[in-house]
Amino acid sequence: MKPASRLFYLSLFALWSPEAQCKSDESCAISPKAIVSDACASYSTLEQLNRDIKPALEDLTRTTDFFSHYRLNLFNKECPFWNDENGMCGNIACAVETLDNEEDIPEVWRAKELGKLEGPRAKHPGKSVQKEEPKRPLQGKLGEDVGESCVVEYDDECDDRDYCVPDDEGASSKGDYVSLLRNPERFTGYAGDGAKQVWDAIYRENCFQKSSFPKSASLGDTYSVPKNPAAQDFRAVMQAAGRQHMLEQQREQNPLVPFVTKTGLESEDECLEKRVFYKIVSGMHASISTHLCWDFLNQTTGQWQPNLSCYINRLHKFPERISNLYFNYALLTRAVAKLGPYLSSHEEYTFCTGDPAQDADTRAKVLAVTSKAANTVPGPVFDESIMFKNGEGPSLKEDFRNRFRNISRLMDCVGCDKCRLWGKLQTAGYGTALKVLFEFANNDTSATSSETDEIPFKLKRTELVALFNTYARLSSSLDAIQKFRAMVEESEEGQQPQSHEQIEGSENSGAHHIPDRAKKPRHVIVPTPDAADHAEASDTNTATTAVDEAKAAGVTPAPKVEHQQQVEVDNNDDDDDDDEFHEFQRQPQQPDTDPNFVYKKRTLKDDFENEFRAVFAAFKLVIRSYLNLPALIYEITITELKRFWQFYVGLPVMPRTWEFRRPSLDEL
């Protein structure tokens, strides 16, 4: 009974604990010193690491022919999951061309043009051409200044340990070589049902199901008592409370956010391997969204510029997405660092077979990146050695690999050429990182020499290009996220002084808080005409002096009131409860349009009619409330039944739409 009682008290204390006071939800979720979930480094550590690596990484991917060109089968594959004609409503012929303002946009800025690939393309040469022209197998189709021996891929063999589907597998065409510099990842206008269908398939059709081997976690392992069970129970309780709180906040902003019980991916109580899978997908999505928001085309002016509202709506309001982006950066940093020793020597890997000078230059730039990734931060930023270690490890790894291959296949369903290019490249990059982390031997004494020797030849050129370019994309995402965050802070700080000055201005002008009772409608009893004439005669000199002073100061005086009357002061309060009482308030006499109007003395008949109208209006109000009572009780009953059902099945309970409260003094 000890664990049960301990868990009960831990749960009780966790639920009673007050929420942390933060400036915003984002500052609580992403603190610089906080450790990224399931990684081994803090947010500030990864940001500092990115500042050190980013210059060398950009130099590698932008100035070398090997890493600036990519080979893929972009046009000769069909979507294997649904019919393109029915499923690609986000394509140029459906969701893009039918936009109302598409015709008003210059043709060069339209989504159809933005999605096209730019620059020269070259077909993959056959083996005979490769033998006849080893130095120029592409025959100059990519340009005379491109080192073709650094671009052409000579190994077309596939590996069953791949985490993505090679583009050349089972295809009639060997693919095209395209320039990544001429086709940057940025806004293309690709949106609509087609894009949503692809992401829905990635998130929902590739989610893990419940374990097929619920008791297999202990297979092959000796039984041992878990260490610190109280700490583990407390950690589980705190994580569950935090997830539930975050889920409720998300569903308040967007009711379409899926529940954790439906997806099975977001849940932290799943095993580490399943959490890593979901974080990779979510982080990739966040990275793509960051690039689209940072390099956004203003289709009115034709300028490429950051879109702050795009960032706020897609990322800033969802700190877990940004956290997953940081996790992906840590994962790829570990893969690049682990790959460094295998690319260090010329005997292990050759980048440019026909150009030793370019080969040496490319190797030096690659090693500059891998050395910074391995040595900038003490210790690994991600520990892959703890994954796939229990009894279910082999089957779970195979399931992990197959589901990531499904994501690779889904990229053929994207209807935009540039989007499909970068989608294929980044899924291949993440697949290569997973292959390096989970299939390659670690650099320890347990790794045999045979394992170490065979590893480099399992990586094809496309895998290396995809890995380092995906790493560069994540690096740019982290840099853009920090700049966007600074822009948000500047915009918030820019609004704060204005409101502060307004508050100070109201205080200096003598404005005070007006109680609610003083805001209610009042009757102002105006003196009789004789008294008014007497007051006017006695104050003539004072009024004349005030008018002269006002004119001298440049202020237009208010017009003189000829006939004062009994009026009702109403501040147009927004209280709806007061509005329904206005109909039976005593109405004062209204003057005629005659300028010589004289107030008549109220008679007994006038008082009786006025009181009768007020009593009749109050009677109608009471009867109406009784008639509405059954419908009100029915609505309250339905609401409470819904709340009970949500509580019973474990869903977030919606707030009440009604309440019991005592009437205030003003209402009485």
Swiss-Prot record:
Q: How is this protein positioned relative to the membrane?
A: Peripheral membrane protein
Compartments annotated for it: namely: Endoplasmic reticulum membrane
Query: Which positions bind FAD?
Result: R186, T188, W199, S282, H285, R314
Q: Which GO terms describe its molecular function?
A: FAD binding; protein-disulfide reductase activity; thiol oxidase activity
UniProt keyword annotations, A-Z: Disulfide bond, Electron transport, Endoplasmic reticulum, FAD, Flavoprotein, Glycoprotein, Membrane, Oxidoreductase, Redox-active center, Signal, Transport
Which positions make up the signal peptide?
Answer: 1-22
The family database entries (Pfam families) matched by this protein are listed as: ERO1
Which segments carry the region annotation Disordered? 116-142, 488-519, 554-597
Report if keyword Kinase is assigned.
no
Record GO biological process = protein folding in endoplasmic reticulum
Q: How does it assemble?
A: May function both as a monomer and a homodimer.
Q: Could you identify this protein by its name?
A: Endoplasmic reticulum oxidoreductin-1
Q: Whose protein is this, by species?
A: Neurospora crassa (strain ATCC 24698 / 74-OR23-1A / CBS 708.71 / DSM 1257 / FGSC 987)
Q: Top-down, what is the taxonomic lineage of the species of origin?
A: Eukaryota, Fungi, Dikarya, Ascomycota, Pezizomycotina
Gene giving rise to this polypeptide: ero-1
